[in-house]
Amino acid sequence: LETLSALDGVTHFVHLGDIFEASAASVHPDEHDHTLLDEYRHASAFLASIRSVLPKRTHFHAIMGNHDDNLRSQDPRRIPKALRDVTDFMRTEPFSHEAKFWHWTPYRKDKRGCLEIGPVVLTHGFDVGQNSDELEALQFMNMTGGAAHRLFIRGHTHRPVPPTQCHRTRSIPLPWWYMNAGTCGPLSPSWMARRDTSQWGAAIAVVDMVRDPSHRNRGRQWEARLIQMDE
């Protein structure tokens, strides 16, 4: 929050998703110390705290992640049909009140599942391979018209990546860039004990841009940086 409050001229804030752990909707049976109601309370307070440190005129956006979508998907392995009305966080207190302050983007791998702000395209993310940031950047650039000089931002992999240019080959650059903001969650969760989390991290992607699309034929009309939360 201190990092956010120190930023000047913020007009848009985008949460890239997985606001909830959604352990109640996991297909892997387990017992947790917290309940789904606890998650709603924590998420509501967390999003409200973000709004409290940014200018009142800021546009607040939330892109649903796969964990969030698990609570709303019609999948009987996760949530029985008879319970879905009460697990839909958009209609369940204490979270639904806070949700009204945010503009929501669904979890879909198509144009409806991303948010476009000027030359920037944002989504939660879907794949986790080492080159998935670049591959999804190319996919979403195609989905959104293929205009040059755009920046793609996502999360999902939990691995922060600074602004990086896409390449056809090592010697042939493409006119698109990507970055990854990592995760806001735990960096060494128990369920990852047998896997490598050394590249995991929390970060904030900060972008200064010209939003007018008529400027895109002049080249890159944005500057971006990644603020690592451990810095």
Predicted regions and their residues:
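Flexible, charged surface loops at secondary-structure boundaries
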Residues: 5-9, 54-56, 114-117, 141-148, ...
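A broad structural signal for short, well-ordered beta-strand segments within beta-sheet-rich domains
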Residues: 10, 102, 219-221
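Conserved beta-sheet core of the metallophosphoesterase superfamily
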Residues: 126-227
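Structural motif
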Residues: 12, 59, 120-121, 151-153
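Acidic carboxylate-rich catalytic motifs and surrounding loops in phosphoryl-/glycosyl-chemistry enzymes
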Residues: 59-67, 105-111, 220, 225-229
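Active-site-proximal loop/helix segment associated with metal-binding centers of metalloenzymes
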Residues: 77-136, 183
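Core catalytic region of metal-dependent phosphoesterases/phosphodiesterases
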Residues: 1-98
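A short, terminal or domain-edge coil/loop segment
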Residues: 64-77, 112-127, 163-173
